[in-house]
Amino acid sequence: MSWLRFWGPWPLLTWQLLSLLVKEAQPLVWVKDPLQLTSNPLGPPEPWSSRSSHLPWESPHAPAPPAAPGDFDYLGPSASSQMSALPQEPTENLAPFLKELDSAGELPLGPEPFLAAHQDLNDKRTPEERLPEVVPLLNRDQNQALVQLPRLKWVQTTDLDRAAGHQADEILVPLDSKVSRPTKFVVSPKNLKKDLAERWSLPEIVGIPHQLSKPQRQKQTLPDDYLSMDTLYPGSLPPELRVNADEPPGPPEQVGLSQFHLEPKSQNPETLEDIQSSSLQEEAPAQLLQLPQEVEPSTQQEAPALPPESSMESLAQTPLNHEVTVQPPGEDQAHYNLPKFTVKPADVEVTMTSEPKNETESTQAQQEAPIQPPEEAEPSSTALRTTDPPPEHPEVTLPPSDKGQAQHSHLTEATVQPLDLELSITTEPTTEVKPSPTTEETSAQPPDPGLAITPEPTTEIGHSTALEKTRAPHPDQVQTLHRSLTEVTGPPTKLESSQDSLVQSETAPEEQKASTSTNICELCTCGDETLSCVGLSPKQRLRQVPVPEPDTYNGIFTTLNFQGNYISYLDGNVWKAYSWTEKLILSENYLTELPKDSFEGLLYLQYLDLSCNKIRYIERQTFESLPFLQYINLGCNLITKLSLGTFQAWHGMQFLHNLILNRNPLTTVEDPYLFELPALKYLDMGTTHITLTTLKNILTMTVELEKLILPSHMACCLCQFKNSIEAVCKTVKLHCNTACLTNSIHCPEEASVGNPEGAFMKMLQARKQHMSTQLTIESEAPSDSSGINLSGFGGDQLEIQLTEQLRSLIPNEDVRKFMSHVIRTLKMECSETHVQGSCAKLMLRTGLLMKLLSEQQEAKALNVEWDTDQQKTNYINENMEQNEQKEQKSSELMKEVPGDDYKNKLIFAISVTVILIILIIIFCLIEVNSHKRASEKYKDNPSISGA
């Protein structure tokens, strides 16, 4: 019993809660749905019940606001009676498209009990009775905020196209809209799903500014549920199609808020975009900004523009509702079920102007698309500056073709994210399209500026962005196919070219071929082993070194003269065609620098003229590939400094005799290899700004120099001390002109040059002792010229093998490469009679070069040996001197001590005394023994003693 007392009141409490929940969920009145589907031939239209989420969240007993003109209450009992009944016979054709809306979208707004109750109510219905869901979209300025739809007003409309088999429906208009025209929805009861989902190919524009996205799959046709969508209020889209302005834009699959089923008719003065297509094409991956291609429809279009109605510069206005009405097809056509829908784009700026006429030759059908542009918009304006969509209702009528064919009209579906994108849709008057294969051109603009779509077959694009060209098949092949336009996107800086670029792309290979391989003897003069391209007209002048065709000239070119052309750079690979060239003239061109590989391949070159160009910089070891070079003319350029290694080469430039550097703003010479050129005899540095330090280095280090040309001011300074200089160094002669002798020239170096004890005079004295070559110094003399040589560094297998075989014989890598190349040339190319003379010269020069190099090596070796012997001799001499010095020092020390003689004498005396003592002792012992013997004899014979 205790359990019964505990559970007894529970059903009552539960029933009270459920009753409150039902009262809260039950709407006050059954409001007519914003989209009223009316079947004209089948009977009067019956209202659909709107979900309670469309109503404001307020008390059921709250007083209703007073009726305004155009409101439901204002319309009287006839209007209210239509809102009181539930729908009894929903349209069968729309049921399949509406039954998945409940599962496709989730209602993010409203209380949870009301959502659950209302969802259960809809789930209990049959699939034919299910109601479309309207999900409010989150406001742009408020994240996850509740958005209430405006109050709706109902306007009585006339029946449109009450033909058999068609159905016209009405869409309610918000009360705050300035235009009371309702949205109309005309539905064909047959093949709606098939025609909309499969046959209408909609090229899409997905505006995704400020973000690049690339889909992983191709964009497919929208699901059937979305094609059957009756009302496109902000909340009516499923979550995957909703776009939050605060979130970064996603990939193109996440379609933006608004979808415009509009014919792409646009003419933008800033951007023109042509799309001609008549076949099923795969959609290109989406990029930064996606533009709809120009559709080449098989119908004639007429789009008279209606007068504007209101200003589009406001920042907060009612939604822009596009009203689309579709005419019924002919008797022999398949039924086209074209929906009329209302679109509410967010923060999309649109300008639409009309096109009078488009003519095609494939089919003859007409489409009328009256567009109602915004009021007070400037004629030249391409974008409308609005934050909220304008309160306009452009009405577009798109009747299908009256031909019984499988071709379908091309519609442009513009899907734009609410990110302040400016869309301009204009058209070109009178566009003629032929059924022959066309060129599809698509133009892309940077993000955020106005987007233009222009259906123009031939395009002149003034924008800097370029066009992408493809070929479309013949329209006859499309009659059995569904026309599907490619979704074209592209970063604005990646696409290139317009129609002119097509010509350039076709002619560029020809020009490149002509510039790299051509019959040069038709343009220039060929003969006597000379190629001369001098005196050409400005249009014929060369811009790079030409490469002759193999059979252009029967012989070799030993002299190349390209003087007075427009050559601005040198490619080392081009010289392989002139492997026997000995003289190269490139004066009066537009060279600005000399890279290291500028003359790679001119192995036998002897004469090089680079005068009167615009050379500013010479890379290190530029002349290393010219071992036999005798003459270099670098005059009349813009050289200000000779950097370290300019004349550095493994071969030491043994044959360079003449070097001209005049008429350059040269101030600094940092390359010591210039002063150490072993064979340099003529150096012209006139009209430069060299210093006295450079002159000292030349006089000190350039051993074989015979003639030196100096700037006039420096030469005249030296001429003031002509007698003193020639007296100090007899190997230096000054040739002074009359101007230097008669005119008094200020000489900044006078103090250092005129001082007999100065550095300059000491340098001349050192030159006199070490150099015997007579040096003549002049002022601003004209340059000499001489030269001859040729080239060709190869890299074939034979040369590589020779290099490997010479590794053990020649340790120097540069010399080894040079010798292997010479051997390869003598083996492979010298078999022909017309090059035998050049081969003989090559052998002589190679032998001379090797001789000079070997002499230098021997001289270095002798110097090293002499240095070693000298070091040994010096070491020995130093040691001997050190020993002698030590002995002298010891003897001096002995002499300096006073008791040394006394000690020696004492030692001598002691030794003598000892010897004398020993002798005395021995004598004494002898005497003692003699006396003993005498006494013994006397004792034995006494008679002897008595007698």
Swiss-Prot record:
Residues 42-88, 226-257, 294-458, 484-514 are annotated as: Disordered. One of its GO terms (cellular component) is membrane. Keywords: Coiled coil, Glycoprotein, Leucine-rich repeat, Membrane, Repeat, Signal, Transmembrane, Transmembrane helix. Its main location: membrane. Residues 927-947 are cytoplasmic. Glycans are attached at N358, N789. The keyword Signal applies. This is Leucine-rich repeat-containing protein 37B. The lineage of its organism: Eukaryota, Metazoa, Chordata, Craniata, Vertebrata. The gene is LRRC37B.
